[in-house]
Amino acid sequence: MADNFDRTADERIEFTTSKEVTVAPTFDDMHLKENLLRGIYAYGFESPSAIQSRAIVQICKGRDTIAQAQSGTGKTATFAISILQVIDTALRETQALVLSPTRELATQIQNVIMAVGDYMNVQCHACIGGTNVGDDIRKLDHGQHVVSGTPGRVADMIRRRHLRTRHIKMLVLDEADDLLARGFREQIYDVYRYLPPATQVVVLSATLPYDVLSMTTKFMTDPVRILVKRDELTLEGLKQYFIAVEKEEWKFDTLCDLYDTLTITQAVIFCNTRRKVDWLTDKMREANFTVSSMHGEMPQKERDSIMQDFRQGNSRVLISTDVWARGIDVQQVSLVINYDLPSNRENYIHRIGRSGRFGRKGVAINFVTSEDVRILRDIELYYSTQIDEMPMNVADLLG
């Protein structure tokens, strides 16, 4: 069910917003199309989350919008609903374009748009790298109301004139901080140049570093701002621990000791490099542990089937790089292990946010060598949080 996050945690989120932003307490108050409302309720949403109740009406009015939202707060549905409200399904042309940093996220967004727009006969295509270009060309030539994609492939399809931009009225940049961190700036600017001058721009980002704000000034006119108060990007409900490992080499034995605990539910283990993911996966398998792994170098088909197995619960332990850390919605994950602490502290909340899916309880365990102590302290300071040494009864915490 879509509507299974913790409402009380949601209600506690405090925002600083532009003065014209009001709160719509129900979806009915938003004056949405009848068939869209049917789709929203059929999808499992009962009432809007904090970000939805503030942002949807502003986006539907055509305002450029910057919304600060973490994974799991209902942000994907925020722009999915807004897009479905403003497009004209009688016109078989692309009217909204969503760019996101990973193929998995782009596909997940496509799934949400198709599901919520189920009664509207909407056409939405995921235009992503690593897939057959011929399929893209066929789908786009056929006509799609919405395209959800990664910047490189989208820019390519626009340049080849298969993705027609003249009817586009909304550009959504999801996980904008990560789009820029992954070096997509040039492709985003390329795409933007092809869009009609009056295109509305909606930016969603968990953090708002300088480069995100500088991009918004180039793309946006008098944007509405819906920002979570700094200290409310919360790690609430997540228990965070560290295990002191004297040397890097000892991390592996520590992980093996924890394996039985990991499989109580599902766990994700993060490493900082693709090479480390492959190395750890091989080593775990040699020791007869069942694990699956995923990183950005894998062919798209393989990544899709690994994600599907994990979503369906067929695999219990997934080893990954940060490619997985943004926005991938797997409800059962309640344990995250940072085998390596993230090199970028802003990724910490994305990684462990995976374990608490917005108000769901979760446990995060950080492996810390003596060299890592400084990074751990930096993370604690940055998030005003406390990370304690792990107690012996970690299995009880997951019960």
Swiss-Prot record:
GO terms for cellular component: nucleolus. InterPro entries: DEAD/DEAH_box_helicase_dom, Helicase_ATP-bd, Helicase_C-like, P-loop_NTPase, RNA_helicase_DEAD_Q_motif. Residues 56-226 form the Helicase ATP-binding domain. Belongs to the DEAD box helicase family. DDX48/FAL1 subfamily. It catalyses: ATP + H2O = ADP + phosphate + H(+). GO terms for molecular function: ATP binding; ATP hydrolysis activity; RNA binding; RNA helicase activity. ATP-dependent RNA helicase involved in 40S ribosomal subunit biogenesis. Required for the processing and cleavage of 35S pre-rRNA at sites A0, A1, and A2, leading to mature 18S rRNA. This is ATP-dependent RNA helicase FAL1. Keywords: ATP-binding, Helicase, Hydrolase, Nucleotide-binding, Nucleus, Ribosome biogenesis, RNA-binding, rRNA processing. The Q motif is unique to and characteristic of the DEAD box family of RNA helicases and controls ATP binding and hydrolysis. The keyword Transferase does not apply. ATP binds at A69, Q70, S71, G72, T73, G74, K75, T76.
